[in-house]
Amino acid sequence: ILKKSLKKIDPINFKELMSDDSIVLLDTRKTDQFVKCHLKDSIYIGLDGRFAPWVGEILKDINTPIVFICELNREREVITRLSRIGFDNCLGYISVDNSTNLELYQETNSLESIDPKIFIKNNSNSKILDVRTKSEYNNGSFKNAINIPLNKIDSSLSYPKDKKLQLFCAGGYRSVIACSILLKNGYTNLVNVEKGYSRIKKLISSWL
């Protein structure tokens, strides 16, 4: 599996490969790297979070063909961790360091990501989504936030795709996954709240 999957993809091969709509472009880098610049239509599930459970939950079908984006020298780790949960259909990878120009592959996006202090002071003009689990939400959330857990975001959200949506989770990992799914589904006005509800809660209690 490792030998088959350990195939570096150059921009020309990438364009040919991605003409197949069934291929999932999986970005496994750190959250802040994805936020800053990522390939259009890529799904974010970072290696440094609960990687395997979320791959299983979001991609579902173990036969899904995957091209992944990773940090330099983490290629084997991605393939091994995918393989452990049955995802063996890796077609290749793009490894990224400071000199990599992702725009050579295809159009790139960035994700607006804001400090919780800004979010708390300025949230009246948008819908707010809490993408944590129902039980986390029931234990306390931000005023006016609507709960759509991450594993239901793909099927449960019906909202105008150009209207502003602000998303948070507990610590800032799941909300970026959710944003990546919504971006791929055509949402264009998304804001990720960094550090999530754990930080929001601390700030609010310190201001009271």
Regions found by a protein language model. Give the residues of each.
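C-terminal accessory/connector segments of nucleic-acid motor ATPases
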Residues: 1-20, 30-34
